[in-house]
Amino acid sequence: VCRVYIPKPGSSKQRPLGIPALEDKVVQAGLVRILEAVYEADFIADSYGFRPGRGCHDALRALSVTVESGGVHYIVEADIRGFFDNVEHEWLMKFLGHRIGDKRVLRYVQRFLKAGVFELGEIAATEQGTPQGGVISPLLANIYLHYSLDLWYTRVFSRTCGGRSRLIRYADDFVVCFQQGNDAQRFRGELEQRLGLFGLEVAAEKTKVLEFGPFAASKAKARGEKPQTFDFLGLTHYCSRTRNGRRFRMKRLTSRKKFRVKLLTFKEWLKANRTTPAPELMKTVVAKVRGHIAYYGVTDNSRGIGRYVHEVSKLLFKWLNRRGKRGSLTLEKFCKFLKRFPLPRPLIRVNLLASK
């Protein structure tokens, strides 16, 4: 596996990617088909990441239905520190051994995990972790969390709760909804102990229990505080009400962090392609904006995607102005340019309030 580092947008840190050789990719793709045939029947319904026919919007829709159906008053927002780098090979192979009887399949997975990484001209052994970038890595991550988190929650913890609860997970990103505050606090404490058994660490600074639901805003106001919000899959979720004010609504907006990162990434791309001919440049710009709207254009986020398109047009104006004599591109000329190469309209594409 060849390890390369890519910059994390908006951060000085870098993310390691493990890129397997072409032959290994073919073998891994075959292993994925075999393992999926077994584990798709085992995975819990509320595991949405990297599974056939499921995606981020399904997880967001499940969260919306759960919170707005009533009985949810607390949310646990959780974060696992460096999950992919801390998967313990011994535990993963034990988990696989529960369902996979073919020793050849297990040997292939073991070889992939122990293949080592080629970095800076040297081969280094890999004693733990599953490299991000591998074809099979997302599935192995799901299997690891299925045994270390999902089964513990569904078969043990949830049965001891005094009220309703629901865990919604997308890969290593998950939130848990609770009716009772003591259940939420207890989960927060026991989660750390549970994941610690399998070499995983809860990021304490990013894991919190927050009051949420129909009465959270009024209670916060009575205390002179702002209502709490939480982030999940790039969106900030907050307490609100319907237009007539009669019913509670959970609404969402592109998170500030993701918004900054997306704009910074776009700005860096523009800088790198500032000499690209306008027709070719705008073809890619339109595709990028369309992709952003396809993901973030969800119920209640009109403001978020509208602001993104507005900021993209401002960056375009700035960089196109730098091509020639500074100030040569007037606003009038730029408007004509956008008529010739229009940006996608910021319309809501995904309804999170309706069943799929």
Q: Locations of the language-model features?
A:
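Non-catalytic terminal/accessory segments
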Residues: 1-356
